Structures are given as structure tokens and as C-alpha cells.
Amino acid sequence: RGDFIKLTIPFYSTNSEIGNPELPSISKLISVPTGSDIEIKILNKVSKKIILSEYNIKNQIFPHQPSISKSALAEEIKFHINDNVYKKDDFINEKIFKTEMLGKMREVQLARLIISPYSYNPVKQELEIITSLELEVKFVSEKNSNLNSSYYSPEFDHLYKKCINYLPPSPEDIITTYPTKYVIVSDPLFQSSLQPFIEWKTKKGFQIIEAYTNDPNVGTTTSSIKSYVQSLYNSATVNDPAPTYLLIVGDIAQIPSFSGNSGSHVSDLFYCEFDGNGDFYPEMYYGRFSGNTVDEIENQIEKTLTHEKYLFTDPNFLDDIVLVAGVDGAYAPTYGNGQINYATDNYFNIAHNLTIHNYLYGSGTPITSDMPQASASIISNVSEGTALANYTAHCGYNGWGDPSFNSSDVTTLQNYNEYGLVISNCCLPNKFDEPECFGEALLRVENKGAVGHIGASNNTYWDEDYWWSVGNTSNITANPTYSGTGLGAYDSWMHENGEHEDDWFITQAQILHAGNLAVTEAGGAEEYYWEIYHLMGDPSLMPYVG
């Protein structure tokens, strides 16, 4: 269809309809007081017009395209353009501001505030830009409620802080006032094996609630188990707050999973969604020790205890990081390399005394991901022990696609007592309704593999995985900057750029939630992402780096 131009601005995303000119907008999360309506009034506005031809710009603005699934073939990708819109001699714009009510997370009502300061006339090639805007946001009919004190958890403040207007409770005596409850739902087969894990978590200060499926109050179905967990949540009081963590112990034959609402996939999300009338924002952090046998569960328990107690024979492996932008001729040069470059530029580098095993696509590293030796080299790096291994591109349920690293390779690993977190931003690596997915293989293997695996139970998308890792931005580039993006999973985990302590996401489940919340802020396929991204491992574990 010819050439177009793109408007990209740091921190901006887009709110344009598919096929319409892609105009930058600002998208921020806000918290809405219980029972209130939102009123927004413009107090001051300054704008100006720009004639693009005066800047020697003759091409029209690029039409907004849907995010592309990482499972899509190049020949299947359709170009979207609304020709009638591009023929209009009039300014095309979204509302200057609008709010979208989202859902609740532990009784905090979330909404998205979108500000669209750009209008565009595609015939005259003119832009109208709001250069200064002052808004007044009021919450009308606000009701007083002490629900938050019953459901408040300091470990969720990290999520609420994503809302630009969130005010936390008084910090006085937070640890003693708001104890952290940890619920374990397990097949009774694993009750004895879980006791060392429970003893350790109790020593750490968690209040552990054990629930086994042979208890009629718990049961063996998704509905009965959810009803039990929800009863713990709903019965919360100021002096006995709602639980924060859920660990599911067993494969789907022992503890079944839900079917997703936004696609055909398994999802544990709904065990932890209670207060949003069917929304998709969890009220608890959750993870799964997936296993069918006592040995498979005990292997995960032992690795978790070894990691948390820092019982490594040689902890030097925690200095090693593996980062891979997998093979894709169309998207890897920008999306894949951009994600990995952001990680190495900001966090995982020599300046942090880390040893980086970096695999960019095409060029830029000693071994690029499209070289024949890449697969063997990556497997060797992991086999020698890594604090983090992160891959973005194509996968199947049994592992990374190209370069290949899959479940059969896990059995050959030699990283005994040297295992960390693996993050797979790709399709299906945590599809745990298969006999054994990649995440399950990494966790179940004895004394090697990984202590945690974050990945999806269905196909993922290029835009959303980029936002998940790097943060919300419309400027998807091979060299993103911290100043040009919102907070993604990397930033929230590593917290080295002056982020307030409340913005630190340091447990395995918090890292996952930070990525999903970046997708929510961007306005991407958020329901789908909250449903498909899962943690195999202990949700409260804080993975070491360095």
C-alpha cells in the first residue's frame, strides 16, 4: 500500500481503532474509590496546528495494526487500513480524554485513564496537537468503606502503585498489622512431602493454611476448590486479613485447572479472582508445583528450599545470565532484539558484575540466534548454571523453538545445585494440560533445571510480550530506553532507577504480575494475558541475581 510515517513519543501508546491513523495517546492506571463515579473537566488547554508538508513529510500516518500472534505465519498477516477514513478532509481524533472501568484487585477498583492529544487530517496532511492540558478529576458519590483494611496486603502495594493516584494505608506496624497468609491446596498424596516446606515458610513468618482435596470442604473440582479459597478471602477481617499467596500442588489430574474465557487454554487465574464480578484481576499471587508423583513434587520442594536458604555449593552461577532473541526474520530484529537490548543496557551487564550470554538475532553478539551453533551453546550455558534464562520468539509446549531448547534437553543438563528462574516469552511453554510441558520439565527434574518458570499456556503476541518485559510504549524499537517506556517486568524486578520500594516486584509471582500489569496499562490483550501467563514454582520465592 505504499509508504507511511509513524508518530512515536516516549511513554505514549495508542488508542486508535484498527485501520485508522495511529495517533499517540497516554494511558495510565487509576484507582477509583468504592461506589464513586468519575467526572473529568478541562481546566486549561493549549493546542497548535502543524502542516506536515512544511517538514517535508508527504506520506500519510501509518494505520494502526492489531498485535500479531507469535504463532502467525508471515503470509497470514493482513494489512488493515480504513480507506474511507483516509479520504476524509477532516480531523480524525479520539476523545481528548476518557476512562475505562476495568475490574477489582483485592477490592481496589482499577480504571484506565486515556488522554489523546493528537488529531489528524489525512487529506490536508495536518496535525493538531494539544501542547498543554490541565484536567480536574473528581470522584463523585464516594462511599466510605473499610473493606480495604480487611483485604489489604503490603505485598500487593507494588501493584496498586501502578495507579497514579493510589494512596496506601498508614505504614505504621504494617508487618504485624497485616500478616501474610499463604494457602496451599494439594492432593493428600503430597501432604507428608510438604511438611519441610511448610515448616520453612512458617519460620519465614507466613501464616500457612493447608488444604487437601480429601477434605469435603475443599473437594476435587475447580468449583469446590475455588469456593474454599474464596471463603478464606471473603471471611477476612481487619484483624485477620485475606490470604496473599496460593500454591497449587499437583498436576491437573490431582488439582484441575479452569478453561480460559478468552481462548482455548488452561488457566489457574480463576482460583484467585473473587471480587470483580467476573473480571480477570487476581486477588492473590499464585503458582503451581505440578507433579504426578511424590518424587516430582519433592524435587520442586528441595530446589525451592535450597534456593531460599542459599544452600548452593558454589553460588557463582548467580552471576550468569542467558538472554535470547530467537529467530524470526520479520519481528526479531526489532521486537526480540529490542527486548534483549533493553535488558542488557539497563540491568544484565558487566557493570553489574554479571556474565552475560547474549544471543541477538542477525548481528550484535559473538553467536547470534540464527547461527547453527546457537542451540548447543545456549543449552551449555544453562547446563553450567544461570540465575536467569530469558527467551523471546517462537515456542511449542515442549520448549523454545529456534534456537531449540526443549524438554528432552532438560534431562541432559548438568546444573546440579545451580538453578534459577527461566522466563519464556513465547507460545505454549506452560501449556500444562499436556503430559509434560517445558515449564513442568524444568521444575520436576531432580536438583537441576529451574526453580521457577514463567510462561504462557497459549500463544503470545509480539506487542504484548514486548510491553510485558520492557514496559508500555508505542515506540517499539531495537534500542528502547528506560526514559521512553513505562515500567515492565525487568524494571520492577531489578528496581535500579530510583523506583520507590513500593514499585519493587521481587517474588516470582510479582514479576509475572508486573509484566501483566504493563500489558494492562498499554491497553493490549490484557484479559488473555492474565489468563495465560503462569508461574511454575513457589509464588513467594525471591530469585537471586548476582
How would you name each of these model-derived features?
Residues 1-546:
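Cysteine-dependent hydrolase recognition
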